[in-house]
Amino acid sequence: MPTHLEGDLVVDGHRFALVVGRFNEHVTEDLLGGALDTLERHGADLDEVTVVHVPGSWEIPVAAQKCARTGDYDAVICLGAVVRGETPHFDYVCSGATSGTMQTSLDTEVPVLFGILTTDTVDQAIARAGSKAGNKGREAAEAAIEMATLMPKLEG
């Protein structure tokens, strides 16, 4: 029989940092609210959660990396919103935020969760921050809890 390992959704003392971009704040605040509510519902003491605000999604990876390297957190949740405009700037920001968060996770072996919306319109971003399409902040927080509880099991 194969061995199956998976995390669960019980915080059980795990510590979390959230790195939140302020750009498109009307969207990112809803993502943050969803993430914090989810962490609390699964047992987190919000007094033990750190929220780091950065100017925008471009700055998220470096702040996430600093958090991950402290050793104080079992997972880092990245929340932001990038909405396509008329120039290639959207592509550069999305690419940098995506690769930066993934590289941070790989380099530090701390789960760094990608809750950065990359949408064509503001309405799409709003829908993914709590209206029609759920709340991607909640989903990122659930994934963070699951990964935080899985990682110790992988250390063998």
From Swiss-Prot:
Its biological purpose: Catalyzes the formation of 6,7-dimethyl-8-ribityllumazine by condensation of 5-amino-6-(D-ribitylamino)uracil with 3,4-dihydroxy-2-butanone 4-phosphate. This is the penultimate step in the biosynthesis of riboflavin.
Gene: ribH
Annotated active site: 89
Name listed for the protein in its UniProt record: 6,7-dimethyl-8-ribityllumazine synthase
Any single biological process term in GO: riboflavin biosynthetic process
Family indicated by similarity: Belongs to the DMRL synthase family.
Keywords recorded for this protein, A-Z: Riboflavin biosynthesis, Transferase
GO cellular component: cytosol; riboflavin synthase complex
Residues binding (2S)-2-hydroxy-3-oxobutyl phosphate, per UniProt: 86-87, 128
Catalytic activity annotation: (2S)-2-hydroxy-3-oxobutyl phosphate + 5-amino-6-(D-ribitylamino)uracil = 6,7-dimethyl-8-(1-D-ribityl)lumazine + phosphate + 2 H2O + H(+)
Organism encoding this protein: Salinibacter ruber (strain DSM 13855 / M31)
